[in-house]
């Protein structure tokens, strides 16, 4: 809470000198207006995404369109836009939904599916790695990462909502290889080719660990498939948004 107060005071001082616009709808005098901020507290959607090993559960806040798309772009590219609270709230929704998807939720009513053969019976210990998609060295240097803070929020909520015996940790386990280029502005085929062989693993999870990949946007799934390759497999994906109809 103290961090939120400090961020609020800082935004107020900056706003008094330099007018701001809502990152989502461009309304004046708000970094995020109440309507756009509420997108982070809407229910998460559970869908699926194709991977090299078959469909993976995909938990997302919505489509890559409208205010949600503009908020993500501002988080990645605007030095004046602080959407930390938005990422925290959205991550909490995603993490809570993941508990049901993975079959580790503390409440039986929260379960929407489980990973047959992967999740031990109730009472057994379960380890979950929450792995953020890798950022370029430039984005890391500028402090404009989105996947890492989102992954931390996802992990906190997943741990808080999980049954006893479930251990959740954020593992920043994947890096882009030298020479890997940005995916921004690329078409589907270019994205797929651009991500093939572009990553390396700093750590590989043991076979009995559940692995969740977290990214700000999932488009063609090229990043997910490359993370799956270097980590030896994934069990679910969490993202702020994805293109197309949520089903």
What are these regions (language model features)?
Residues 1-247:
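Glycine-rich phosphate/pyrophosphate-handling loop used in enzymes and phosphotransfer proteins
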């Amino acid at each position: 809470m103290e961090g939120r107060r400090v961020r609020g005071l800082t935004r107020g001082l900056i706003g008094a000198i330099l007018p701001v616009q809502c990152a989502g709808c461009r309304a004046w005098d708000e970094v995020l207006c109440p309507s756009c901020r509420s997108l982070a507290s809407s229910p998460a959607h559970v869908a699926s995404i194709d991977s090299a090993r078959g469909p993976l559960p995909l938990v997302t806040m919505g489509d890559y369109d409208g205010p949600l798309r503009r908020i993500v772009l501002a988080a990645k590219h605007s030095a004046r836009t602080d959407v930390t609270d938005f990422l925290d709230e959205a991550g909490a929704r995603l993490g809570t939904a993941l508990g049901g998807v993975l079959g580790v939720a503390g409440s039986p009513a929260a379960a929407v599916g489980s990973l047959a053969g992967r999740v031990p019976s109730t009472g057994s210990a379960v380890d979950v790695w929450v792995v953020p998609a890798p950022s370029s060295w430039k984005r890391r240097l500028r402090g404009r990462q989105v996947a890492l803070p989102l992954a931390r929020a996802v992990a906190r909520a997943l741990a808080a909502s999980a049954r006893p015996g479930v251990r959740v940790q954020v593992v920043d386990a994947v890096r882009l290889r030298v020479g890997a280029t940005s995916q921004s502005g690329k078409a589907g085929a270019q994205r797929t080719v651009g991500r093939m062989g572009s990553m390396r693993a700093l750590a590989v999870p043991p076979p009995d660990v559940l692995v969740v990949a977290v990214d700000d946007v999932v488009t063609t799934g090229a990043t997910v498939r490359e993370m799956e390759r270097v980590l030896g497999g994934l069990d679910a994906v969490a993202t702020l948004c994805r293109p197309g109809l949520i089903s």
